[in-house]
Amino acid sequence: MKKKTSLSEEDQALFRQLMVGTRQIKQDTIVHRPLRKKITEVPTRRLIQEQADASHYFSDEFQPLLNTEGPVKYVREDVSHFELKKMRRGDYSPELFLDLHGLTQLQAKQELGALIAACRREHIFCACVMHGHGKHILKQQTPLWLAQHPHVMAFHQAPKEYGGDAALLVLIEVEEWQPPELP
């Protein structure tokens, strides 16, 4: 294939005259890749869907049978009762706290669902839910909702340093973390 030049012979001669004593630069070091935006945040649509899925389990019509005497507590059938004892003694310290003060029941359900979804996503085993005293509506409903969720392993009235009888410590079942497979 024949090279086409767009410069006249005079211009080419002038260019060569000006370039006397220079040498061509070698590009042998770095190849620049085009900049791409890294996606580090989970898309908000997915987060909203996770929260909605997690709050789907909470029903006001179904009321699980919980012991009404003594502190509020619950343990799933396949979980050891020793976990309740460890929660009561304060062996677990919560990594996430949820404050339900001032929320409606619908908002509280959504926030509980969001808390459980966040714990599973971040591999957090123990969380604290502060329902407060108030008119005792959320104080009564929160344990009933938590007992219905399949990812809640156990909950117990929180020790005094985490809110006492105005809060619950919740153990959440998280998936085992596995390192990614190498190719």
UniProtKB/Swiss-Prot annotation:
PROSITE patterns: SMR
Domain Smr span(s) in chain numbering: 98-173
InterPro entries reported in the protein's UniProt record: Smr_dom, Smr_dom_sf, SmrB-like
Domain of life: Bacteria
Record-linked SUPFAM superfamilies: SMR domain-like (SSF160443)
MF terms in GO: RNA endonuclease activity; rRNA binding
Entry keyword set: Endonuclease, Hydrolase, Nuclease, RNA-binding, rRNA-binding
Assembly, per entry: Associates with collided ribosomes, but not with correctly translating polysomes.
Name listed for the protein in its UniProt record: Ribosome rescue factor SmrB
Source species of the chain: Salmonella paratyphi A (strain AKU_12601)
Encoding gene (name): smrB
